[in-house]
């Protein structure tokens, strides 16, 4: 925690400096590698961690070493993780998917924007200084065409996006040869179907079945394809966004880059302050990961924050605005029905979802059904035209342990299952949002209810938090629940930062939340038995047992913190090769003692073996050569 709090001006200046000096940067002793698919432009980025050799014998003057294999790991940082790529935030990222989109010939450029609000913003000269300069001309599906990955999958088509994902999900484990690294405990998948090798056809089939989604708006060609589904790696989402009282465009772009560096698979822009439209454009043009939003937040801004004044027309205009900017998935609170609102009256904490409370207030003030529910088919038509995935929001999620798994929560969940089937009629991809605050013994029911009533559509949860007593540490309380529900089958975990319930997270909070959730996701992958998930753990354990400190730091999710903690007590360079750490010291290190025991046992075995052979030699008459029948 910083000792001195920066002023708003200093925070913006710091963010601007970050953007101005931004370069592609690799983690310590790592390098960016690319694995090429069936065509030259399918190049999957990964990070490869270089390891030092193991000392296996010899003397001081003639040491003998054994090489250790480099470890490939999944990398969400896009061009920001490649030192050979020139970064220019003003120009945005390269349009990786544009050739694939154009080759399908099922979309066309629009001659004008569909959103009245977008036209207004573009006509306002006063916004020129804030506006991203390299605006794309948006695309839309041609008449009679559908451009969603679900549509292609149902047609039996394997898209370049699907091939990219298959290679990415295998995490380069085919490069690993050592048996020690490849060993893995069998997992317990609770019905998940995890193939030994993920193929493009498997990706296609999972998407076609609705069990996985590929958030990939045709107007976000900068994004690197990824998949969300329980038969794949558990993913992590990071939330960013400005508010009416804090943050700027510069700071949000900085948070985006920072999020992808620390492992965010997707990022949600939850901006509610000024310049939402302009901020989102900067984020999208510079994002290598899918971007999600909650459109009702911006629609509310358009009616001056008065929920009762919301209209379907204002919301529809917002959907078109965001779809044509390139938003990859919308959170839509269409399951908050008028008849469910009274179910929350006896709750300890009522309705805690912002989107849920907005729609509940609208329903009660008009005594009408939720207009998102009433117009859901029109929402699907818009999403199908741009390939925007739907994240069906849990507006009635529990906001406290006491309210977990109640009538309102599950009534809404069942409605989300009905809406899922409607979205699938339009070939729109769907995932389901989940809680919230749930004690450990009640978590699994959330997963089983979702799988049954939402037809195995991917589940995406906020935690859940397993206790309510730890403000300031809710990344821990929720990380516990996240690991559990990820194991049970949840496809994506929405991170929680230390600032949850307390304030808007800053850059360091974003990192803390992401590291916590990457741990939870990885723990779930291990428990499910995702092929290759244990390779990095094995490499770390081997480095730890062999006192390869530099390799331990570099294999860590956060190499910088691992190194800093070690150096607090053993800062000298000699500490990086010492066969002990400061916890036990040189005489009581369990691993050092284990090595000595192993060496001693090996020596004893050799001695006993030689003695046995000597006795055998004498028993056979002491002859150098024996007749065949005596051997």
Curated annotation (Swiss-Prot):
Matches recorded under InterPro entries: ThiC, ThiC-associated_dom, ThiC/Bza_core_dom, ThiC/BzaA/B
Residues at which substrate binds: 239, 268, 297, 333, 353-355, 394-397, 433, 460
This enzyme's EC code(s): 4.1.99.17
Residues holding [4Fe-4S] cluster: 581, 584, 589
Cofactor mode of binding and number, as noted: Binds 1 [4Fe-4S] cluster per subunit. The cluster is coordinated with 3 cysteines and an exchangeable S-adenosyl-L-methionine.
Catalyzed reactions per annotation: 5-amino-1-(5-phospho-beta-D-ribosyl)imidazole + S-adenosyl-L-methionine = 4-amino-2-methyl-5-(phosphooxymethyl)pyrimidine + CO + 5'-deoxyadenosine + formate + L-methionine + 3 H(+)
Major enzyme class: lyase
Keyword Nuclease: no
Any one biological process term the GO annotation gives: thiamine diphosphate biosynthetic process
Pathway this chain belongs to: Cofactor biosynthesis; thiamine diphosphate biosynthesis
GO molecular function: 4 iron, 4 sulfur cluster binding; carbon-carbon lyase activity; zinc ion binding
Cofactor(s) required, per the database record: [4Fe-4S] cluster
Binding site for Zn(2+): 437, 501
Similarity comment text for this entry: Belongs to the ThiC family.
HAMAP family given in the database record: ThiC
Subunit structure: Homodimer.
Task of the protein: Catalyzes the synthesis of the hydroxymethylpyrimidine phosphate (HMP-P) moiety of thiamine from aminoimidazole ribotide (AIR) in a radical S-adenosyl-L-methionine (SAM)-dependent reaction.
The protein's name: Phosphomethylpyrimidine synthase
GN (gene name): thiC
């Amino acid at each position: 925690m910083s000792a001195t709090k920066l002023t708003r001006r200093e925070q913006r200046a710091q963010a601007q400096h970050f953007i101005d000096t931004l370069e592609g940067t690799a983690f310590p002793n790592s390098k960016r590698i690319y694995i090429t698919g069936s065509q030259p432009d399918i190049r999957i980025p990964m990070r490869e961690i270089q390891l030092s050799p193991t000392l296996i014998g010899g003397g001081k003057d003639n040491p003998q070493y054994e090489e250790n294999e480099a470890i490939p790991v999944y990398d969400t940082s896009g061009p920001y993780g490649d030192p050979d790529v020139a970064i220019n935030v003003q120009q945005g990222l390269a349009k990786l998917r544009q050739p694939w989109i154009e080759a399908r010939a099922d979309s066309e450029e629009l001659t004008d924007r569909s959103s009245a609000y977008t036209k207004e913003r573009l006509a306002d000269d006063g916004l020129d200084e804030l506006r991203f300069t390299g605006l794309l001309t948006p695309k839309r599906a041609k008449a009679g065409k559908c451009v969603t990955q679900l549509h292609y999958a149902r047609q039996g088509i394997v898209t370049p996006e699907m091939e990219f994902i298959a290679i990415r999900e295998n995490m380069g484990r085919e490069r690993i040869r050592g048996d020690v690294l490849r060993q893995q405990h069998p997992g317990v998948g609770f019905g998940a179907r995890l193939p030994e090798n993920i193929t493009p056809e498997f990706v296609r089939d999972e998407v076609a079945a609705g069990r996985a989604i590929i958030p990939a708006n045709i107007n976000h060609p900068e994004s690197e394809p990824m998949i969300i589904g329980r038969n794949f790696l558990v993913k992590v989402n990071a939330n960013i966004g400005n508010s009416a009282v804090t943050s700027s465009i510069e700071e949000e772009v900085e948070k985006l880059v920072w999020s992808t560096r620390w492992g965010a698979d997707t990022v949600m822009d939850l901006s509610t302050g000024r310049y939402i439209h302009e901020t989102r454009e900067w984020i999208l043009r510079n994002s290598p990961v899918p971007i999600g939003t909650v459109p009702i937040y911006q629609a509310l801004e358009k009616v001056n924050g008065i929920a009762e004044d919301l209209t379907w027309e204002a919301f529809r205009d917002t959907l078109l605005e965001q779809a044509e900017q390139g938003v990859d998935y919308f959170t839509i609170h269409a399951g908050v029905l008028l008849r469910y609102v009274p179910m929350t009256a006896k709750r300890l904490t009522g309705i805690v979802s912002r989107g849920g409370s907005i729609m509940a207030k609208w329903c009660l003030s008009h005594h009408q059904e939720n207009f998102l529910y009433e117009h859901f088919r029109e929402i699907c038509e818009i999403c199908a035209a741009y390939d925007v995935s739907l994240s069906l929001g849990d507006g009635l999620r529990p906001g406290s342990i006491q309210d977990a798994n109640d009538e309102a929560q599950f009534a809404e969940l069942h409605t989300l299952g009905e809406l899922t089937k409607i979205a699938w009629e339009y070939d729109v991809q769907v995932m389901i949002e989940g809680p919230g605050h749930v004690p450990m013994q009640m978590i699994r029911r959330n997963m089983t209810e979702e799988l049954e009533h939402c037809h195995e559509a991917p589940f995406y949860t906020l935690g859940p938090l397993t206790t309510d007593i730890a403000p300031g540490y809710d990344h821990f309380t929720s990380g516990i629940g996240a690991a559990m529900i990820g194991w049970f089958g949840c496809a994506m975990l929405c991170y929680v930062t230390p600032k949850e319930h307390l304030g808007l997270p800053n850059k360091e909070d974003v990192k803390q939340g992401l590291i916590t959730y990457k741990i939870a996701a990885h723990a779930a992958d291990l428990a499910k038995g995702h092929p290759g998930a244990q390779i990095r753990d094995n490499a770390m354990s081997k480095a730890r047992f062999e006192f390869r400190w530099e390799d331990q730091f570099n294999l860590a999710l956060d190499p910088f913190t691992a190194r800093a903690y070690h150096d607090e007590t053993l800062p000298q360079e000699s500490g990086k090769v010492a066969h002990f750490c400061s916890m036990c010291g040189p005489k009581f290190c369990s691993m050092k003692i284990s090595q000595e025991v192993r060496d001693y046992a090996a020596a004893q075995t050799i001695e006993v073996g030689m003695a046995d052979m000597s006795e055998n030699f004498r028993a056979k008459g002491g002859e150098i050569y024996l007749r065949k029948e005596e051997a």
